[in-house]
Structure formats: C-alpha cells, structure tokens
Amino acid sequence: MRAQNVDVEVLSPLSTRTKYLFAPVKFITRARQKSVTLDHFPVILRAYARQIEAFVRQRSIDVVFSPSTIPITLLQCGKPIVTWTDAVFHSMNDYYGKAFAHMTKAAVARGKWQEETALRNCSVAAYASAWALEGASRLTDSTKLKILPFGSSLPVTHNADDVVRLAAEKRSTRKKKCELLFVGVNWERKGGAVAVETARLLNDAGIETRLRIVGSQPVGEIPPFVEALGFISKSSDQGKQRLIDLFRSADIFILPTKAEAAGIVFSEASSFGLPSVTYATGGVSDYVRNGINGVCIEPGGSAAKFACEIQKMVESPSEYEAYSIRAFQEYKNRLNWETSVRKLIDICAQTVPE
C-alpha cells in the first residue's frame, strides 16, 4: 500500500499476554491428544480489540485493515473494517479433514463463531479465491465480499518478449525432454507421489524427464530422475535467487495438491511463463485457469492423466509456447500484488463516508 502512496500506520504484533491465562487449557487438551486455538476465545479476541481501539483513538485513521479476521472479531472503533484472507474457518474445517480432526468439538464451535462474528463486524471481506468467497457467503451478506487473488512473492525483471523467447528456446532445444518443478512443503497433501509417478510415466513414454522437488522430502526411495532440493527460503537473497533460477529453467510446474485454499506458488509459476498442471480443487482454479495458463485435472485423476496432459505440451511447441505466453499474461493482468493491492485500496476508499 505504501508503494502506491497510501499512508499506513502499522500495529504489529499484537500483545498475546492474555494467552498465558489459558495454559491449563492447552495442557489438558494436549494430554487428551486434542488441540485448541486460543485466538478463538472471546477474552483474547477482546484483548486484541482493545489494543486496536486504543491505537485508532490516538491517530487519524480512515480504515482499519487486517490480513486476518481474528483481530477484528470484536473490534468497535467507529471506523470501516476491511479484511483480506484466503479462507474461512468452517470451509477449512470441512475441506482439510485430517488437519482439523484433532480439534475438540468446542474448539470447532468457537472457530465457527469467531469467523461469523468477524464477518458481521467488518465492512468488506476480500478473499483470495471464489472457493473461499463461497464459504464466506454462507455466513454474511454476499454484497460485502470481494475476490482478490494473491500475487507472486518472487521479483520479476523479465517482460513478455523474454518469456516468448525463452519458451521457444526450451522447446527447440528440449524436443523430447521435460523439466518438471514441484514446490510444496507437505508431501502427502501436495501430491508428491503423483508427481513422481507422472515423471516416471513420461520417462517410460520416451520423454526424458527430470522432476525437481523443493520443500518436501520425498517419501521412500528417490528414483534417479528425481532431484530433491529440500526447503529453500525466500527470506534470503540466495534462496530467492535459487528459486528464480529453478522457475526459469523449468518447463512445467506440477502440483497435484489434494487441498489448497489459495495458490501463491501458481502465481509464481505464471510469472515465469510456466504452465501449471494440478487438480481443480479449493481455490486452485482462480490461479490455474484450465486451458489458459495450465491444466486443472478433476480431483482423483491419475498420474497417467497428468502425464498425458504434459506430453501434449512437450510434443507441441506451438501449444507449449501459447500456454507460456498466456501464463505470463495472467500474471501481469491478475496474479500480481500490485494489481490486487490497487483494487484493495479502491475497496478501502469506498468504505470511507464522504
């Protein structure tokens, strides 16, 4: 926002001292092999609200913005409240299954109450995908809901001509070769096994394929065509440059994710002109438009289906180049922070009384 000449007063982090009162609760639930989210307790939500209210009183504030619904749940500051996030609690609870199975029934009920209360309290709630917005629409007036996709977190210095040139170069020098890139930290949920099997099938079909894996450690024996690179942090210049080099050198981004609320990594793939091949699940379809900047396969689709779609791209230079160009266009038009933040600023401005 500051980059777009908006005055921003930051209150972060919020004090969490009140959480110490709930140490016995954490201990008991852990002993029962369950968990509880302390941020959903009203007393903690009220403590957050008091901090924000005091901050607002001492400054000239037009709009309160939060990237989470939690701090604004019980906020009463007399100002418009805007939030921007990637999902609502009840959708995540239903969608992610195992990840929420350890929560107590009371904890789940509090989570749903917190989200619904926050949505009633805010002026506008923006979400990173249509899937997330649909979940929120079950809790509040849909007129206050907006879709704003998340952008790429990697710097982009190239232009459309560079993308066209690189795509043509890749297909002219790698006629029966394919460099796949997989980026994800949860091997099972991100579909690592499907990615490995896809690469195996492509090799069996006569397409010399290498799969580079970032983030996750593959389960089981690592085949010779798989290169496991471990976790690479974007927080360091060295790590950021390594990721840039990997995206730039890859042909296709593959992520057979079983559950995904949003897709920053798909925005990053598009920013380098990489077609993505993934499942049409959760918020993914807002980042990978089937037939535009990649292919979205129906959930449960086999590795053979992934291999088939990738083989089509590899064996048709014109089709690959078209995907690559459209991917970069999607990044320039939608999947970048500048565009989404500019829309967010307009949304915030519209909430301010004249």
Predicted feature locations:
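Acceptor-binding helix/loop patch of EC 2.4 sugar-transfer enzymes
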Residues: R32, G78, V82-E116
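Donor nucleotide-sugar binding/catalytic pocket of nucleotide-sugar-dependent glycosyltransferases
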Residues: T104-V108, W113-A167
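Conserved donor-binding/catalytic core segment of Leloir-type glycosyltransferases
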Residues: A126, V164-K190, V196-L201, L211
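Nucleotide-activated donor-binding/catalytic signature segment of Leloir-type glycosyltransferases, i.e.
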Residues: G215-I252
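Aromatic "clamp/platform" in nucleotide-sugar-dependent glycosyltransferases that forms part
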Residues: K258
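Short hydrophobic beta-strand element within catalytic cores of glycosyltransferases
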Residues: P275-T278, V288
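A short, well-ordered alpha-helix in the C-terminal region of glycosyltransferases
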Residues: K312, E319-R334, K343
